[in-house]
Amino acid sequence: MLSRLLSGYASVEGRYDELLSAPGIPRPHWDAFLRSLAARQGLEVSETLALMESEMRENGITYNVYADPKGADRPWEVDPLPLLLSATEWDEIAAGIAQRADLLNRVLGDIYGPQELLRSGAIPPSIIFGHSGYLHQVQGIRPPGGVHLFNYAADLARSPDGHWWVVNDRTQAPSGSGYALENRLVVSRVFPQMFRDLHVQHLASFFDALRESLLRWAPKDVVDRASERANPLVVLLTPGPYNETYFEHALLARYLGFPLVEGSDLTVRDGCVWMKTVEGLKRVNAILRRQDDDYCD
């Protein structure tokens, strides 16, 4: 059955083949998935794909496309054939991305701090000071824990010899985590047995770490008088419903348990940010922004 499934598949010369290690031979981490897929009847596969599309529509998953003549809200689509990576390969990717994020955070800390990289000539000052993204207003600001780059993502591509390349850094308000979460939820409902058998690494630990980091870096002197325990208020700042990833903003706010706010929902008084509510102003202790930094004000 597996040979029939792969009968029409052909590798492209000069490209890395994610699926096969040799003609007709799946890579080890693909084998179980392909055998499970091959065991399904054609009608069953069609019904499964239809169920997946139905789940997406019912959940209202959209991606807003600016200036799209078909309308702003475009339904989100999930490729039924996933990209499978072995645990070993993913660990290598994760370590490399973490190292790159740490480097970029240190560079930001120096540029907005002592500027030793500029003084030494390692980075020409004209590149920094002439860049539209450099914000003179925040020069000298020291964020909690020295974390200038709180959230980071990278666009990856596979090289012809199988190595991974970073083709773009996402350092402003990287999107994708919410869509990845929704994809996982839909796929786990549509392919429950296959999802369990493949031992897919869960995403919950990432979102738990994100939530805990925001709460940890929030001021410690905020106390909820009712419970007499630290209870910082964290909000997720969105540009609004016309942003291309607004669905993700709403999803993340709900999943993390943070209020979703726009700029008009906030005000600044006595050097502090406050959220407007029907019960009055509530002090905000941390903001997870989903818009570019120069648009925050």
Task: Label each PLM-derived region with a short phrase.
Residues 1-297:
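Preference for protein termini
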